[in-house]
Regions:
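Charge-dense, helix-prone N-terminal extensions
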Residues: 1-104
């Protein structure tokens, strides 16, 4: 099932105080970037983020989900209605997000 544009827009609004949030549509889902680094994505209208150490430390009740068959587990963020929580979460994880690989 593809994610809705409405859910994407809602998440982007919730993250509006975080500078550098962008997204890319991919096969009916959305990859979320934070200052050029992949932070997570929206899959089946669920916000999932990379399971980096700072995210594991920040999220109190971790629930891992697979975004799609064959993918690595990611952390499901259930508190999408809490703008302050999402803002602080994304700011907390930035330094642990992998930097993009240089294209050859």
């Amino acid at each position: 099932m593809a994610s809705s544009k409405e859910f994407l827009e809602y998440i982007l609004e919730q993250l509006s105080e975080v500078e550098g949030i962008t997204y890319r549509a991919m096969m009916g889902e959305y990859i979320i970037y934070y200052k050029g680094r992949i932070a997570g994505g929206i899959y089946d209208d669920r916000l999932l983020i990379k399971p980096v150490k700072s995210a594991i430390d920040y999220v109190s009740d971790i629930r891992y989900e697979v975004p799609y068959e064959g993918a690595k587990e990611m952390i499901l963020i259930e508190e999408v209605d809490n703008k302050e929580y999402l803002t602080e979460l994304f700011k907390a994880i930035y330094d642990d997000l992998p930097t993009p690989k240089k294209k050859k």
